[in-house]
């Protein structure tokens, strides 16, 4: 399958891919953060920063980013077996029902969008139960010739922005405090991307029991703004 080769265009495609206006519903998920606030674990910006940095370095860097790299390589080489293997591997790494459903819903929404944006390879994933955000994100990155290193940082930055947006509503944080938190997260995002891209297969894997517990308890939380 052909890819675009204009570097400037690839950069703008990436901006579109991580834009908060992308119609995939990511804003409706907090990945357990809502329960963590409700339980009193996160009361201020410093606590939120610790929560986010822990996930960056102990979950996203050893799980999502190396899997993203392998999915990207699989799409580039048209290796359908590898695409499905790493998609299933990622799904197995999602520790709760809510986290699995979040990944599937957002992934299927991105599949529908990419199909409508003239990436026909996305079409079979619209109803695929193992469709996930990383799988379809990797497809777009491969076909739009976005450099993997830049795409990995952007992947983490989009996650971070979504989490900070949720924290602003839930803690609550002021808008300036939210922007200060994003400023603080810029360096850890780059470090986590580099860490994840350097991992060998046998080094992949990680998780945070606190996040898994928060996500599990969120399923029965009485009053909720977010779907996870």
Curated annotation (Swiss-Prot):
GO cellular component: cytoplasm
InterPro entries: UreF, UreF_sf
Pfam families associated with the record: UreF
Compartments in which it is found: Cytoplasm
Predominant location: cytoplasm
A GO molecular-function descriptor: nickel cation binding
Source organism, top-level taxon: Bacteria
Gene3D superfamilies membership: Urease accessory protein UreF
Keywords: Chaperone, Cytoplasm, Nickel insertion
UniProt family annotation: Belongs to the UreF family.
Subunit structure: UreD, UreF and UreG form a complex that acts as a GTP-hydrolysis-dependent molecular chaperone, activating the urease apoprotein by helping to assemble the nickel containing metallocenter of UreC. The UreE protein probably delivers the nickel.
Job description of the protein: Required for maturation of urease via the functional incorporation of the urease nickel metallocenter.
Record protein name field: Urease accessory protein UreF
Gene name of the record: ureF
């Amino acid at each position: 399958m052909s890819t675009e080769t204009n570097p400037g265009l690839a950069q703008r495609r990436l901006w579109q891919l991580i834009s908060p206006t992308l119609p995939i519903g990511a804003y409706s998920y907090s990945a357990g953060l809502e329960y963590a606030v409700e339980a009193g674990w996160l009361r201020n910006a410093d606590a939120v920063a610790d929560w986010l940095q822990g996930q960056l370095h102990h979950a996203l860097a050893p799980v999502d980013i190396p899997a993203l790299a392998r999915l990207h390589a699989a799409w580039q080489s048209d290796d359908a077996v590898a695409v499905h293997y790493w998609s299933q591997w990622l799904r197995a790494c999602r520790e709760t029902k809510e986290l699995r459903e979040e990944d599937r819903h957002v992934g299927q929404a991105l599949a529908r969008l990419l199909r409508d944006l003239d990436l026909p390879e996305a079409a079979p994933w619209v109803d695929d139960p193992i469709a996930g955000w990383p799988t379809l994100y990797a497809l777009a990155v491969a076909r739009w010739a976005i450099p993997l290193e830049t795409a990995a940082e952007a992947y983490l930055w989009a996650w971070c922005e979504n989490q900070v947006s949720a924290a602003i509503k839930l803690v609550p944080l002021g808008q300036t405090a939210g922007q200060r938190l994003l400023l603080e997260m810029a360096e850890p995002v780059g470090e986590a991307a580099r860490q994840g891209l350097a991992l060998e297969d046998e080094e992949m894997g990680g998780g945070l029991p606190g996040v898994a517990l928060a996500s599990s308890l969120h399923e029965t939380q009485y009053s909720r703004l977010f779907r996870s």
